[in-house]
Amino acid sequence: MSRPKPIHNAQPEQVFIESLDTEGRGIARVEGKVLFVDGALPGERVWARRTQNHKSFDRAELLQVDKASSLRVSPPCPHFGVCGGCSLQHLEPAAQVAIKQRQLEDHLWRIGKVRPERVLPPIHGPSLGYRSKARLSVRTPKTRGAMVGFRERNSSYVVDMGQCLTLDPRVGQRILSLRTLIGQMQSPQDFPQIEVAATPDAVALVFRHMRPLAESDLQHLRAFGEQHDLQIWLQPRGPETLYPLWPEQPEPLHYDLPDYRLRLRFDPLVFTQVNQAANQVMVRRAMALLQPQPGEHILDLFCGLGNFTLPIARLGAQVLGIEGDARLVALAAENAAANGLADKARYAVADLTQARMEDFAPAGAIDKMLIDPPRSGAIEVLRSLTPGVRRLVYVSCNPATLARDAEYLVHERGYRLRAAGVVNMFPHTAHVESIALFER
């Protein structure tokens, strides 16, 4: 791929915005070439200036909105437009969801040549203060004090921010305090990032550090944790070196799925859904689509901690969860035992980009399946789909790979796309999470 060429001293031009791309940028067409305009909305006529030239498209900065969309709103965050954490705060929240639903359906048809028989109502959660997981960057420029937050849009610089409205407020309202804390360290440049993991009962901050810490640094960190009622964890090298600093024996982090009388424990660095309110509704939706029954044998691929495995087991089915991360599998097994479901839920470690279904599920042994793959999708394991799987629920974080996999399932394996809809897991961002039901 050729590198973009910067455009200097381009003249402003008036353009009409047709739609949004998958990163939340406005799309215009000028003399047959696509122009991406940050901050512009569909239906708007704007003045823009080109900043980058690519072979098939150009990028532009928004200068002025001549005709504003009726869906344009004032962003609640003063850092919007600079911060790369959000891209859609200027769009009315209900319209954000409608655009994501349209993008999902467009991808399914354009890439997969398939349309859902039923469009599911969107799943919502809170739009502010919802982020329970995040990675905050840390920088210490010579001209300013320590910077803590998200990176600037299209840049490696960290935003000069004092708060974050989408983060859990126990962290989002303490950005300035975190900046002060980093500034007190003997070598603040040795802290590249802070991981956030929040639950209703506790918040853990994981400080990644490049060199051994001085005793004064440890004292500052302990005092910060005690003052703000936060768990402080340290990670000197890889994830396996993670350990708690304050308190020395913290209460385990957990989240609940009350509909299924479940409590799932986890470590601060492992994957959990970022929006727990939306996750609870998504799990409920997945169970309604999958309809686990006692006596059925169900496969849960990319199972993680057991977010779907354990509800399936609670509803009476026998379920096998497969995951590539051995630490997640160990936690999932612990969660099954802690919830009294060790006889219903079993787990195994496998690289699902390489494994075949018959490696862990003989032909005819599986009645239904749920998959929750990463952005790359699940085409490798789907190609080895064994006969007998009559119902498949697909939870996706990338509509493009969902559409690709849907094309294979529908046009080559004889499934029907019974239903599909979006999950607004990341409000104010262009991220499209979705859930789909396939049957044959």
From Swiss-Prot:
The protein's matches in PROSITE patterns, at most eight in alphabetical order, are given as: SAM_MT_RNA_M5U, TRAM, TRMA_1, TRMA_2
Record's Gene3D superfamilies?
Answer: 2.40.50.1070, Nucleic acid-binding proteins, Vaccinia Virus protein VP39
Which catalytic residues are annotated? Answer: 397
Q: What is its EC number?
A: 2.1.1.190
Q: Which reaction does it catalyse?
A: uridine(1939) in 23S rRNA + S-adenosyl-L-methionine = 5-methyluridine(1939) in 23S rRNA + S-adenosyl-L-homocysteine + H(+)
Q: What are the binding positions for [4Fe-4S] cluster in this chain?
A: 77, 83, 86, 164
A single Gene Ontology molecular function, please? Answer: rRNA (uridine-C5-)-methyltransferase activity
Q: Is this entry keyworded Metal-binding?
A: yes
Residues noted as binding S-adenosyl-L-methionine in the record, renumbered to the chain: 273, 302, 307, 323, 351, 372
Which CDD domains is this protein grouped with? AdoMet_MTases (cd02440)
UniProt-listed InterPro entries: 23S_rRNA_MeTrfase_RlmD, MeTrfase_TrmA_AS, MeTrfase_TrmA_CS, NA-bd_OB-fold, SAM-dependent_MTases_sf, TRAM_dom, U5_MeTrfase_fam
Superkingdom of source: Bacteria
- Keywords in alphabetical order, please: 4Fe-4S, Iron, Iron-sulfur, Metal-binding, Methyltransferase, rRNA processing, S-adenosyl-L-methionine, Transferase
Entry's Gene Ontology BP terms: rRNA base methylation
Give all residue intervals belonging to the TRAM domain: 6-64
Name the protein family. Belongs to the class I-like SAM-binding methyltransferase superfamily. RNA M5U methyltransferase family. RlmD subfamily.
The function of this protein is: Catalyzes the formation of 5-methyl-uridine at position 1939 (m5U1939) in 23S rRNA.
> PANTHER family this protein is in?
23S RRNA (URACIL(1939)-C(5))-METHYLTRANSFERASE RLMD (PTHR11061:SF49), RNA M5U METHYLTRANSFERASE (PTHR11061)
Its name, as the record gives it, is: 23S rRNA (uracil(1939)-C(5))-methyltransferase RlmD
- Species of the source: Acidithiobacillus ferrooxidans (strain ATCC 23270 / DSM 14882 / CIP 104768 / NCIMB 8455) (Ferrobacillus ferrooxidans (strain ATCC 23270))
**What gene name is given for the protein in this entry?**
rlmD
